[in-house]
């Protein structure tokens, strides 16, 4: 698909509303400011935002040649504040967008942001944006933001290798192997305490569909599509396929046999690691970064727990090896037309964003200042922030407007570990066998209005089927309810967009 260029723009209606409740590093009411100042709105996930005097921020300003003024908004209320900002007319030069929310799509349709695809080719880093990820982050083929890179391949199975050794099994390679491992972790006393107090895999409560849940990953291994399949040239929902039902039947088997936690539908995801760390479960299906978290926690509990955790990228199923990819991005950085009024100003902001992707800028935003936040000896990175959170907060928030295009070049502390190397191998292998969502870039008005309601119908039916409240006919009835509640309308709209995108 070619990323299309938008040539005509609509004016965004402005309301006289004031921005409230945001912590920021400047007090000027002028959104345009001087040409030497770049104003940014970004979410704050840390307890503290970087101050105006942050050494990392000052070094970043020196490197980019711009004074950087950031309006920090608490992450929990970010989308609400975005809507207020868009109505106020008092906009910064760049706004971090977390997702394709209804408010963002409405603003795009009102012509609020620059369409960037004609300009990216003129910049050293931005010109190297991945075409597939650029498509995924687009709105029906039009690019309204510079995506923030995240690994395209993250999904994996995390497993306790000490338990594997104790039950006499090798690392699983197929779905059949996977089942046998979970069964052994339940029945063969993998922790050796003589008690029936372990199970195979822990799964938390998970909202949404096609967003990387353990169920999503396993469905791909079973051969189901990623959110939507293509049949006779048309999109179809994944949950209408035989492969999806095969996966769902497998999930129910795991539940019935006690191989997963009985409270999966309500378990707090913040406690997801605990059963593995505490020796109650032996498997999690999530991401490589979670594997590193668990390994670190286990070593903190007992220094002898070296290399206990390992990972497998994908398991061979009926259709061979397949893996669940991410969209390749986590939000994007947009440029409003009301504050960046001319092409000359646009190119100046793009030059700044391009420079933010240089290795030097990536290190400042993600690692901080050498000698203060970290040290580098013989090429080995060591953080100096472990016992000093205030040092971390000097730069942690700055990573919210780091894009890492064409690739991440900042330092990662565990890069010398066996787990990190396995993660790299999984990414390389996964890119060859990834099953992508063919509708990732498509934004349907029907889904914007009814998507949450429609998704909940399937989410509820999936849980009810797994725990035995409904059978296959009951699930089919839920699919019919989905269709009558707007699903048929959604598929008609998506297929129209899909045909136009080819």
UniProtKB/Swiss-Prot annotation:
Lipid attachment residues per UniProt (S-diacylglycerol cysteine): 22
Membrane topology, as annotated: Lipid-anchor
Domain of life where this protein originates: Bacteria
Pfam families listed in its UniProt record: SBP_bac_1
Keyword Membrane attributed: yes
InterPro entries: Bact_solute-bd_prot1, SBP
Protein's name in the database: Lipoprotein LipO
């Amino acid at each position: 698909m070619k990323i299309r260029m938008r040539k005509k723009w609509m004016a965004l209606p402005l309301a006289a509303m004031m921005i409230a409740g945001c912590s920021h590093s400047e007090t000027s009411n002028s959104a345009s400011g001087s040409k030497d100042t770049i104003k940014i709105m970004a979410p704050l996930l840390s307890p503290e935002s970087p101050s105006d005097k942050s050494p990392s921020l000052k070094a970043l300003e020196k490197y980019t040649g711009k004074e950087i003024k950031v309006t920090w908004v608490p992450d929990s209320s970010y989308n609400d504040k975005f809507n207020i900002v868009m109505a106020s007319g008092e906009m910064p030069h760049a706004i971090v967008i977390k997702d394709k929310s209804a408010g963002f799509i409405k603003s795009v349709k009102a012509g609020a942001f620059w369409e960037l695809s004609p300009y990216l080719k003129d910049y050293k880093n931005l010109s190297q944006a991945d075409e597939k990820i650029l498509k995924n982050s687009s709105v029906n083929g039009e690019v309204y933001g510079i995506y923030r890179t995240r690994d395209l391949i993250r999904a994996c199975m995390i497993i306790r290798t000490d338990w594997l050794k104790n039950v006499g099994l090798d690392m699983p390679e197929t779905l059949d192997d996977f089942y046998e491992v979970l069964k052994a972790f339940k029945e063969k006393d993998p922790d050796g305490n003589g008690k029936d107090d372990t199970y195979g895999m822990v799964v938390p409560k998970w909202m949404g569909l096609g967003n990387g849940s353990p169920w999503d990953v396993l469905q791909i291994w079973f051969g189901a599509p990623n959110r939507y399949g293509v049949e006779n040239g048309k999109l179809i929902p994944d949950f209408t396929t035989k492969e999806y039902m095969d996966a769902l039947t497998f999930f129910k088997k795991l539940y019935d046999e006690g191989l997963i936690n009985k409270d999966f539908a309500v378990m707090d995801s913040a406690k997801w690691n605990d059963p593995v760390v505490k020796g109650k479960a032996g498997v999690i299906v999530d991401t490589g970064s979670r594997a590193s978290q668990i390994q670190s926690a286990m070593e903190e509990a007992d220094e002898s727990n070296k290399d206990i955790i390992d990972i497998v990228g994908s398991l061979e199923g009926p259709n061979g090896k397949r893996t669940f990819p991410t969209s390749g991005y986590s939000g994007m950085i947009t440029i409003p037309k009301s504050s960046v009024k001319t092409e000359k100003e646009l190119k100046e902001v793009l030059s700044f964003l391009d420079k933010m992707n240089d290795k030097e800028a990536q290190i400042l935003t993600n690692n901080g200042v050498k000698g203060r936040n970290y040290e580098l000896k013989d090429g080995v990175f060591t953080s100096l922030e472990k016992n000093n959170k205030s040092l971390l907060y000097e730069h942690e928030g700055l990573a919210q407007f780091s894009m890492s295009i064409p690739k991440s070049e900042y330092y990662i502390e565990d890069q010398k570990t066996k787990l990190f190397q396995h993660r790299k191998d999984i990414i390389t292998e996964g890119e060859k066998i990834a099953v992508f969502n063919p509708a990732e870039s498509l934004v349907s008005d029907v889904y914007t209005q009814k998507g949450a309601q429609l998704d909940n119908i399937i989410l509820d039916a999936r849980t009810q089927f797994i725990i035995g409240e409904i059978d296959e006919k009951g699930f089919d009835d839920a699919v019919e309810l989905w269709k009558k509640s707007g699903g048929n309308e959604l598929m008609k709209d998506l297929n129209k967009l899909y045909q136009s995108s080819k």
